[in-house]
């Protein structure tokens, strides 16, 4: 099949539409502070998009690259399209923010500027300024003897235009850097938040004594944060990475956000020194630095403005009184997070660290929280003399410094730490525990779609799979040998790994379904679909009558509902949990269910070490089948992709189905039912039965 550029949706525009769906949550009937969270998430996503994707396009344009995507849009065309899209969407962001803050005021929760406070609260702000703000802010003069300062990525500042009180004709420009140690808002009372820049503006003349404030403008800068590391030339990768992190802080400016109606001379002053293209200047009529809205959304006094807090549940066959190794030895176990608890994953490593029969623990780490109980358990195990091998991916973007910290701590404890594979990121999520019982070695494995991160496990939907099967023991051992040693053979037998093998396997399974024509069925859930070879194979399958359902949260470059894709339906689910699981079903493959750490993107399939895990266990397959069926029935959180690249909400029917809420309710129902039953085998059977029925 011959493909053409118009058969693909542009990757960058598809991502922007994903982020628009995040912002669209503000239009739904959600608690107000939940809407505020979605604004914070939307703005955080946009920060990273500019730091990496827009910065990359600017570099391609500067290098004279003409085409960089399957749709053959040039870097310049993409940059123009991105700017147009975001300048239009900025108005929607402003509208949602104003609507939400107005509704919050009706609930007696306020964001107020200094000038709108009563005298008593102004005095409290004044006291706070002199005790907490004044000692740490940095006043900066810019003139012939004071060069324009270095501004950190995502730094928040106040630009000022001032004049000498004795000589008003002498106008000067400077800025007040607001350090990150200060909160975004001063909580002047239990229900009133004052933007920090509002207080700083009020006291600008005390910061620059002898000068009169003529104008000020809050602004925020975004820099290129992508790092290029010459791994081939690195003798000490950790040192090279630390140097790269320092250089990241000096990346080129790619965006300037500034308050609307700012003094023209201030805007010119900033543009002159930063050399930012005027289309990359975004003027806002609302507050800047909105990722910090989490500070308000976390207000414990207004919990009625938040969704009810759900507590993940641990279901049989896991039991707090039963060894996790005994449970996994009896059967394979699959859990769906965060509806089911992440605790068994932690217990798997914690128990291994304390078990005298355990001789080896191996694990990959990609994104780890700052205070990780899992890593602490690994440190304890290494300190006790167990053989601990940990692959810490130091190139995990924006987690590099945290991962460096843990890598050093693990090394100091005696663990064997692998920093990465030259030219690749290790994105696979796998751990292996080896126990010696008598003269036999027993293997226990955990394979997952998500990170070993207890914090993100509460808000990301992922699938975890525990097994002790010999074929998984063989392949995970081979995988860790590939990571720690020299190996030209990067192929496994039961598991599939990338680079190359996962893509080959996926294409092979698509071809099998294609050969079955109208009998073929493919259901695939992932974060993003970009790979043009896989998209082409899906088009060919569709033309042969294969029914294809894709559940893709983020980027989708496939264009549905065309002559070549009339049997392909694409939906995206956006809810309070971030859909992160990768689950694939191919009707005529054996086995026909798979979970993976990899999306169908070139970076995952060609430039990362990933794993795809076949699911043989019948109970686990039934659980995945119900999970996919539920998501395909969702008519609350789901959007459908049209052939013009736009997404439409799926209309609700008589039966309202919110897939995330439904899973919360049914896992809770199973948990409550099981708490009444003390018979372990009956409880396990009932859990499976209830999940399937529900």
From Swiss-Prot:
Reactions catalysed, semicolon-separated, are: [phosphate](n) + ATP = [phosphate](n+1) + ADP
Its GO CC terms?
polyphosphate kinase complex
UniProt PTM comment: An intermediate of this reaction is the autophosphorylated ppk in which a phosphate is covalently linked to a histidine residue through a N-P bond.
* Organism lineage string: Bacteria, Pseudomonadati, Campylobacterota, Epsilonproteobacteria, Campylobacterales
- Report keywords, A-Z: ATP-binding, Kinase, Magnesium, Metal-binding, Nucleotide-binding, Phosphoprotein, Transferase
**What PANTHER family does the annotation carry?**
POLYPHOSPHATE KINASE (PTHR30218:SF0)
Specify the protein name. Polyphosphate kinase
Mind listing the GO biological process terms from this record? polyphosphate biosynthetic process
Q: Which InterPro entries match?
A: PP_kinase, PP_kinase_C_1, PP_kinase_middle, PP_kinase_middle_dom_sf, PPK_C_dom2, PPK_N_dom, PPK_N_dom_sf
| Homology family | Belongs to the polyphosphate kinase 1 (PPK1) family.
Q: Does the keyword Ligase apply?
A: no
Q: What is its EC number?
A: 2.7.4.1
Indicate the residues that form the catalytic site.
Answer: 427
- The scientific name of the source species is Campylobacter jejuni subsp. jejuni serotype O:2 (strain ATCC 700819 / NCTC 11168)
Give a short account of what the protein does.
Catalyzes the reversible transfer of the terminal phosphate of ATP to form a long-chain polyphosphate (polyP).
Q: What class of enzyme is it?
A: transferase
- This protein's gene is called ppk
Specify which residues bind ATP according to the UniProt entry for this protein: 45, 460, 553, 580
Keyword Kinase belongs to the record? yes
Q: Which GO terms describe its molecular function?
A: ATP binding; metal ion binding; polyphosphate kinase activity
Task: Name the needed cofactors.
Answer: Mg(2+)
Positions of transmembrane segments: none
- The entry marks the following residues as binding Mg(2+), namely 367, 397
């Amino acid at each position: 099949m011959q493909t053409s550029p118009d058969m693909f949706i542009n990757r960058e525009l598809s991502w922007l539409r994903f982020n628009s769906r995040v912002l669209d949550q503000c239009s739904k009937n959600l608690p107000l502070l939940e809407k505020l969270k979605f604004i914070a998430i939307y703005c955080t996503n946009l920060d990273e998009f500019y730091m990496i994707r827009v910065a990359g396009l600017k570099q391609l344009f500067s290098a004279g690259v003409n085409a960089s995507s399957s749709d053959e849009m040039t870097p310049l065309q993409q940059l123009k399209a991105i700017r147009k899209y975001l300048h239009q969407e900025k108005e929607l962001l402003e509208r949602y923010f104003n609507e939400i803050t107005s509704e919050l005021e009706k609930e007696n929760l306020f964001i107020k500027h200094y000038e709108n406070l009563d005298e008593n609260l102004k005095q409290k702000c004044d006291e706070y300024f002199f005790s907490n703000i004044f000692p740490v802010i940095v006043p900066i003069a810019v003139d012939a003897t004071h060069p324009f300062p270095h501004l950190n990525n995502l730094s928040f500042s106040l630009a000022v235009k001032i004049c000498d009180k004795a000589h008003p004709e002498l106008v000067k420009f400077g800025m007040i850097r607001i350090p990150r140690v200060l909160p975004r808002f001063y909580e002047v009372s239990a229900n009133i938040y004052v933007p920090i820049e509002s207080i700083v503006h009020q006291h600008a003349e005390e910061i620059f004594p002898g000068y009169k404030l003529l104008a000020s403008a809050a602004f925020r800068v975004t820099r290129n944060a992508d790092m290029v590391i010459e791994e081939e030339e690195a003798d000490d990768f950790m040192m090279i990475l630390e140097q790269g992190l320092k250089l990241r802080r000096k990346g080129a400016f790619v965006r300037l956000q500034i308050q609307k109606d700012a003094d023209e001379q201030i805007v010119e002053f900033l543009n002159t020194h930063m050399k930012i293209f005027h289309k990359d200047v975004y003027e806002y009529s609302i507050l800047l630095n909105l990722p910090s809205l989490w500070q308000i959304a976390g207000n414990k006094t207004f919990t009625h403005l938040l969704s009810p807090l759900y507590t993940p549940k641990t279901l049989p066959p896991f039991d707090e009184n039963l060894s996790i190794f005994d449970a996994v030895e009896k059967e394979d176990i699959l859990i769906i997070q965060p509806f089911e608890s992440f605790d068994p994953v932690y217990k798997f490593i914690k128990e291994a660290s304390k078990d005298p029969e355990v001789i080896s623990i191996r694990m990959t780490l990609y994104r780890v929280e700052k205070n990780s109980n899992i890593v602490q358990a690994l440190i304890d195990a290494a300190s006790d003399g167990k053989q601990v091998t940990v692959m810490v991916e130091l190139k995990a973007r924006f987690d590099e410094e945290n991962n460096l910290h843990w890598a050093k701590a693990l090394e100091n404890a005696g663990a064997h730490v692998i920093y990465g594979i030259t030219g690749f990121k290790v994105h696979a999520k796998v751990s292996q525990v080896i126990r010696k019982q008598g003269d036999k070695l027993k293997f226990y494995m955990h394979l997952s779609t998500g990170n070993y991160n207890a914090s993100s496990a509460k808000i990301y939907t992922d699938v975890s799979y525990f097994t002790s099967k010999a074929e998984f023991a063989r392949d995970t051992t081979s995988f860790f040998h590939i990571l720690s040693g020299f190996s030209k053979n990067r192929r496994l037998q039961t598991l599939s790994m990338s680079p190359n093998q996962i893509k080959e396997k996926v294409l092979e399974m698509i071809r099998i379904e294609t050969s079955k024509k109208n009998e073929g069925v493919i259901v695939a859930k992932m974060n993003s679909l970009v790979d043009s070879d896989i998209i082409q194979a899906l088009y060919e399958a569709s033309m042969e009558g294969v029914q294809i359902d894709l559940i893709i949260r983020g980027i989708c470059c496939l264009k549905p509902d065309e002559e070549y894709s009339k049997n392909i339906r694409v939906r995206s689910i956006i809810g309070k949990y971030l859909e992160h699981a990768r689950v694939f079903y191919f009707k005529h493959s054996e086995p026909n269910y798979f979970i993976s750490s990899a999306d169908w993107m070139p970076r995952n399939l060609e430039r990362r070490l990933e794993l795809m895990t076949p699911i043989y266990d019948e109970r686990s397959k039934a659980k995945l089948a119900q999970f996919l069926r539920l998501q395909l029935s969702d008519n609350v959180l789901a959007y459908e992709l049209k052939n013009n690249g736009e997404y439409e909400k799926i209309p609700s029917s008589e039966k309202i189905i919110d897939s995330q809420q439904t899973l919360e309710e049914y896992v809770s129902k199973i948990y409550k039912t099981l708490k009444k039953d003390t018979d372990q085998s009956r409880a396990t059977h009932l859990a499976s039965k209830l999940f399937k029925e529900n």
